[in-house]
Design a protein with these regions (language model features):
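Ser/Thr- (and often Asn-) enriched beta-sheet segments in non-cytosolic proteins
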Residues: 12-16, 29, 63-65, 149, ...
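Active-site or metal-binding loop neighborhoods of secreted/extracellular toxin and effector enzymes
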Residues: 105-167
Length: 167
């Protein structure tokens, strides 16, 4: 487990290593001082408060679950196929999750506003498009880092959508 501090709002990102077969993920969590302040009764209450802060401009800490042994395999059209096992491209998955973490820390995440992350019209779907950097979220339009801006910097194929091929 590695921890990194954010210069903004004294927020922290924790990166926890997971197995190569596990799905990468991130989650909003309260800091120790926020737990003391809000005194959630259960961990579920902690997560609910953190999700609200992650999307309502206040921000909170983030935990990233990531494997240094996994990558996203794309087909020739730039559609994701599956979670692969190329550790040389695992940094792209980490970059994607760090983009989400940046939004959680800033309180601008759309991930917790509801909807299916594979539905590009839902708020959760828009958060994924933002992290990937497609459509109106392309780097050339936003100047915000994205999975695709990282892919481009490293000469890797661009991801054209979030939703996996055939889903």
């Amino acid at each position: 487990v590695q921890r990194f501090l954010s210069a903004r709002k004294n927020r922290k990102v924790t990166i926890a290593e997971i197995g190569a077969e596990a799905q990468p993920n991130n989650r909003a969590v309260l800091s120790a001082s926020e737990v003391e302040k809000y005194d959630p009764e259960t961990f579920a209450d902690n997560l609910a408060l953190a999700k609200e802060r992650a999307r309502k401009g206040k921000g909170c800490n983030a935990i990233i679950e990531w494997s240094p042994h996994s990558n996203i395999e794309l087909n020739s059209n730039g559609s994701p196929l599956r979670l692969g096992s190329n550790p040389e491209e695992s940094f792209v998955v980490l970059a994607h999750e760090l983009i989400h973490a940046q939004h959680i820390l800033a309180g601008t995440s759309k991930a917790y506003n509801g909807g299916d992350r594979y539905d590009e019209t839902s708020e959760a779907g828009k958060e994924e498009l933002r992290a990937v950097g497609v459509g109106k979220y392309e780097y050339r339009k936003t100047r915000q880092p994205s999975e695709n801006s990282i892919r481009q910097e490293h000469g890797l194929p661009i991801r054209k959508k979030y939703k996996p091929h055939g889903r």
